Amino acid sequence: MPLAQLAEPWPNMELVQLDTENGQAAPEEGGNPPCKAKSDITWVEKDLVDSTDKGEGVVKEINITHHVKEGSEKADPSQFELLKVLGQGSFGKVFLVRKITPPDSNHLYAMKVLKKATLKVRDRVRTKIERDILADVNHPFVVKLHYAFQTEGKLYLILDFLRGGDLFTRLSKEVMFTEEDVKFYLAELALGLDHLHSLGIIYRDLKPENILLDEEGHIKLTDFGLSKEAIDHEKKAYSFCGTVEYMAPEVVNRQGHSHSADWWSYGVLMFEMLTGSLPFQGKDRKETMTLILKAKLGMPQFLSAEAQSLLRALFKRNPANRLGSGPDGAEEIKRHPFYSTIDWNKLYRREIKPPFKPAVGQPDDTFYFDTEFTSRTPKDSPGIPPSAGAHQLFRGFSFVATGLMEDSKVKPAQPPLHSVVQQLHGKNIQFSDGYVVKEAIGVGSYSVCKRCIHKTTNMEYAVKVIDKSKRDPSEEIEILLRYGQHPNIITLKDVYDDGKYVYLVTELMRGGELLDKILRQKFFSEREASSVLHTICKTVEYLHSQGVVHRDLKPSNILYVDESGNPESIRICDFGFAKQLRAENGLLMTPCYTANFVAPEVLKRQGYDEGCDIWSLGVLLYTMLAGCTPFANGPSDTPEEILTRIGGGKFSVNGGNWDTISDVAKDLVSKMLHVDPHQRLTAKQVLQHPWITQKDSLPQSQLNYQDVQLVKGAMAATYSALNSSKPSPQLKPIESSILAQRRVKKLPSTTL
């Protein structure tokens, strides 16, 4: 089930009272400021503080010492280029920054900047807590502090930049998942919490927006400003902090709490992930706290017995009886039957594949951060550098297009795109601000592809301009963002949306079309053809395993990124017809969800689309081997002739090149071009075929080809026939029907 909608990932936090270093409460300046009424923010309630906790404490000015990344020199603000504002809290901002000095130049970080002048004593304490904890923690599921330093007026924390956004918001908006999927995230979270507890740290602020995703989909715990360092597990903290719905009973009634309070919050998160709602939530914070202290929790019966058992063990109001509070700590959690399928060692080594991969593109993407912040120009920065200035090359896409940009006819603006695209450049940046458009390099029915030059770097790119009134490119963009990091899939560089057109910027594909290059080579062998198909099929198998079908794998959409002709430089392009497997509500589905809950007819349709991809690769393989296309003799063949041959599965593997081609190659071609899509080999089966696995034993004799233009014309005719609209049936008198005529013959003759 999708998760409930959650709070913003960067809420403004009002901390009314926090402990100072000696464990006492610090007095507030200027009386008691009112608490925020919202229940989804972090806060401290002063009127709940017992009189025994109100003694005046010793206030200490916090002086943050420098923390330097291993192998680096002492850092200062001048070493970081401000790129974007990611968020803003009550006493500081968070920026996306790029390191501009060695040894980690060009690396992206998140930088917290805290102004000393605006910090009250409680905030200074909170900052020191975060800095000390982060400096001590080194764990795969906890955010890492790389640098810490200060100037006369500011404090700086340089942290991991996590591009995936927060776990709950991403899952609630994008994907359908199962109890098995939830188990993965909870298991990683348990390891992160266990590590903090082993250092004597009580997290105390475990809530959805503090669990972030990296680009692979693994979790990272962040924001330790409310954590309490204890000498050992016998020590208790008394400050009232955290987010109310996730508070343990002993935190609410201020009896003092230890690390076991985190396991209560862990149970709240587990309940929320599995059900989409919070276990204890009243109409206001007072009622919510009453429910936490007294309410009996009903357990949803759709949860497994193991999940219900773990929740009951975590929701013990007496912390001494709570699972995880004993001397074995998190080992008690890990031994619970709910986690019987988890390999904890593999999980720690990040060897278990996450159920969901966030759609993130280039390293400086900030899709998953609030546009309220990301659209702002970073203060003290000359401006947001156009992202095409990144110091790396970006791959291009296929050449599909029309003269759209010359169309002066005004059309109504289309609805805004997927939120991912809306957030890319904020609100005011236009494509023409960063690029100069040059000549067209391809045309199509709904888009134009042109060469363009980045104004700052003078680097050449290609831009695909899509008319939104003719096609919604959201699916194409999301697929490229999520899977474009694969080495043989085009990488989306930039996206712009002016309301009428969408601009997809990629690198210019300098190597041209795959078939062009192969047919023009003086020498091309069966062994080389095997290497080419292996690279392409491996990429298609990756897409199919992610629930993505391309649906337009004609040879003109497979290109070389450079002139080398190496299989590694092959790119699958143009995902304009590609689809991701989705639930009825439009959300993506994890592999586990697909296997257990998707209707057979949906899977059958997905299998059909995958079969179409394999058929297209079969056509490509046939052409590489035979030097001609399987179903068209030339561009003059009619669609009816071509479709008849395709429908009958009629193609020849005799004569010409076929006389010297191996039998194992003929076997593979026949199985990829099988007329029944459900009987064709899958991409995985193609990769396991002897023609692929034993390529070193294949012949190296030269293959002969027809004229390049003749082959390309025949290929174009093939796909044109497939895409041509089917003629509507002509209505004729019933008497002309063969069935009616047959029935008339069977009628008994009668005489009056």
From Swiss-Prot:
InterPro entries: AGC-kinase_C, Kinase-like_dom_sf, Pkinase_C, Prot_kinase_dom, Protein_kinase_ATP_BS, Ribosomal_S6_kinase_II, RSK_N, Ser/Thr_kinase_AS. Residues 80-339, 435-692 form the Protein kinase domain. GO terms for cellular component: cytoplasm; nucleoplasm. Residues 340-409 form the AGC-kinase C-terminal domain. Its cofactor is Mg(2+). One of its GO terms (molecular function) is protein serine kinase activity. Activated by multiple phosphorylations on threonine and serine residues. ATP binds at residues 86-94, 112, 441-449, 464. It catalyses: L-seryl-[protein] + ATP = O-phospho-L-seryl-[protein] + ADP + H(+); L-threonyl-[protein] + ATP = O-phospho-L-threonyl-[protein] + ADP + H(+). Signal peptide: none annotated. The active site is at D205 (proton acceptor), D552 (proton acceptor). The modification Phosphothreonine is found at T377, T590. Keywords: ATP-binding, Kinase, Nucleotide-binding, Phosphoprotein, Repeat, Serine/threonine-protein kinase, Transferase. Small and large intestine, spleen, stomach, and bursa, and to a lesser extent lung and kidney. SUPFAM superfamilies: Protein kinase-like (PK-like). Pfam families: Pkinase (PF00069), Pkinase_C (PF00433). One of its GO terms (biological process) is positive regulation of DNA-templated transcription. Autophosphorylated on Ser-398, as part of the activation process. The modification Phosphoserine is found at S239, S381, S398, S749. Its EC number is 2.7.11.1. Serine/threonine kinase that may play a role in mediating the growth-factor and stress induced activation of transcription. Belongs to the protein kinase superfamily. AGC Ser/Thr protein kinase family. S6 kinase subfamily. This is Ribosomal protein S6 kinase 2 alpha. It comes from Gallus gallus (Chicken). The gene is RPS6KA.
